[in-house]
Amino acid sequence: MNSWRVTVCALAAAIVMVGGGSAASQAQTPEVPQIQKVLSAIKAQDKGQLAVSEEDGRFLRVLIATSKAKRALEIGGASGYSAIWIGMGLRETGGTLVTMEYDPVRAKELAENVKRAGLSDIVTVVPGDAFAHLPTLSGSFDFVFLDAWKKDYKRFFEMVYPRLDPRGLFLAHNVVNKRNEMGDFLDVVLKHPALWTTIVSPSGEGMSVSMRVK
């Protein structure tokens, strides 16, 4: 099967597996008790202000696993909820994640939560300004998750796109509920000649999912 078809099938599988709701997805993507404990603690601490929902987290994990991603990048790690879901998927593929968080307090929480979840061997936390740190990273990525300042989405995309592998996935969060805050980012990815882009909404917040086809 062609590699682009494998990636499209991975996306379809992720949508189906998560689309059945939380109970269905829990049955299909179980977490170890240690990690579930950390996720629950983050949810309680953030008091309903999670960077991503549980449904979105499960979607990320399933998409990582089914696309067989190996080198992932997250911009906007917050306190680690999404990084842990991504890390669980990467543990299944043998991959690694670099996650960036600007706020020093949240970056510290992010590192602590990743450690408590037992994912320090998979997830590397980079605190500080992502615009400054991105040029210092080596290599390319086959999975990118963007959940940072919405007004800067286009700029982040332009920085990362040259390092996105062919058939790699670029995901951006909040494209439904905060669409008016991200300027013309969606126009760029929807009309880009080298991307196939769709919008999914596991939880109502929405994600754009773009695959590099050239």
Segments predicted by a language model, with ranges:
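A short alpha-helical cap/connector motif
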Residues: W4, V8-C9, G20-F145, K150-L171, ...
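Hydrophobic alpha-helical segments of integral membrane proteins
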Residues: A13-V18
